[in-house]
Amino acid sequence: MKAMEGKIIQVLGPVVDVEFESYLPAIFEALDINFEVNGVQKSLVLEVAAHLGGNRVRAIAMDMTEGLVRNQVVKARGKMIEVPVGEEVLGRIFNVVGESIDNLEPLKPSLTWPIHRKAPSFEQQSTKTEMFETGIKVIDLLAPYSKGGKVGLFGGAGVGKTVIIMELIHNVAYKHNGYSVFAGVGERTREGNDLYFEMKEGGVLDKVALCYGQMNEPPGARNRIAFTGLTMAEYFRDEKGLDVLMFIDNIFRYAQSGAEMSALLGRIPSAVGYQPTLAGEMGKLQERIASTKNGSITSVQAVYVPADDLTDPAPASVFAHLDATTVLNRKIAEKGIYPAVDPLDSTSRILSPQMIGEKHYEVATGIQQVLQKYKDLQDIIAILGLDELSEEDKKTVERARKIEKFLSQPFFVAEVFTGSPGKYVTLQETLEGFGGILEGKYDHIPENAFYMVGSIQEVLEKAKNMKNS
């Protein structure tokens, strides 16, 4: 047996124990097994997770372990799992070990990076807070993203999480000339498939790299896929000096797969059965998502909240890292207002006059006050009707309804379905429009003119056309 070869001594589901004669692979080192199942040649990658004493290691499999038997030969790589990086990854789909899985020509990478890397040091990190303009009115105005910040995207099924993700990818590609990386962490294969074809249809595929570790895969693949995607994003930030968007769907599944791995490795669980190292593992991933003096990684993370319990250890460990939250609300979607972002529930750390400027802060808080007042008046309106309100309250209700309509916006990636051309609205135009509504400049314009348009100029044109027709 060669020095770097070992043999399998035990297989427990996705956990494999391997014994080496003279060599001891390091923690996180990759091991390769080539074997045959029913006449089909297969290869499997393992990652060393624990040393068991002697020259024995416990490793986590990155794919199904069916067909493995004791005494099979295992080869140590002498290095970690490495994945392709660079512009050649754009428009392709990868699995956790960096193999292309889109049935196209296999990628022969010219450059690979290990998936476990150090977070940027204090000296490398950028301390200035800069707003990241998305071109989506409701986000830029009420819950702005910061460059290199982390955003939580909360929402149930079918309220438009994927459409917002695609629109952000589109706007980053076309307005900021940047790239995006999408990591599908433990979600449905069907959703990954849909996303790929929707992106192809929406024309954004050539600006994004997709990494999938789906629900049906072992916990090792579901956990490490987040690092695979992040490594690709880090290359664009560190080597190309770009501002990259990183999407993780779903960050809860990262914690969940970590819990499964922890139990399989024999660690004693902590609260609610999660791994004792939950906070540390979450920090290891989140700390790598940062702004440096070269570029930035801004991440949007979909967060599944089990049983709607925000105190569950997994979502609670995510909250500590988030700079902004974008909450999608089914009631808003039912009104036909898309994007269905809740203007009162969504938050942002940078929504303060020091960070975004006095004018933006004033307009944003003014809008929130009007919407909150409208929400408070809903019960009275339901019982007594609009006529019983004071003149001032009637004005508030009128403006609030216009604001609600004006927070809707046609998306580029939804053009195929809606038939109305997408709009990118600059922050300047957004502030001008909403500031004008608050000042009462547009009180004479009917509320339907505010629905599904971009800037306030379009509202005026739409109102003019409505009047003429």
From Swiss-Prot:
Pfam families: ATP-synt_ab (PF00006), ATP-synt_ab_N (PF02874), ATP-synt_VA_C (PF22919). Its EC number is 7.1.2.2. InterPro entries: AAA+_ATPase (IPR003593), ATP-synt_VA_C (IPR055190), ATP_synth_F1_bsu (IPR005722), ATPase_a/bsu_AS (IPR020003), ATPase_alpha/beta_chains (IPR050053), ATPase_F1/V1/A1_a/bsu_N (IPR004100), ATPase_F1/V1/A1_a/bsu_N_sf (IPR036121), ATPase_F1/V1/A1_a/bsu_nucl-bd (IPR000194). Keywords: ATP synthesis, ATP-binding, Cell inner membrane, Cell membrane, CF(1), Hydrogen ion transport, Ion transport, Membrane, Nucleotide-binding, Translocase, Transport. One of its GO terms (molecular function) is proton-transporting ATP synthase activity, rotational mechanism. CDD domains: ATP-synt_F1_beta_C (cd18110), ATP-synt_F1_beta_N (cd18115), F1-ATPase_beta_CD (cd01133). Produces ATP from ADP in the presence of a proton gradient across the membrane. The catalytic sites are hosted primarily by the beta subunits. This is ATP synthase subunit beta. The lineage of its organism: Bacteria, Pseudomonadati, Campylobacterota, Epsilonproteobacteria, Campylobacterales. The gene is atpD.
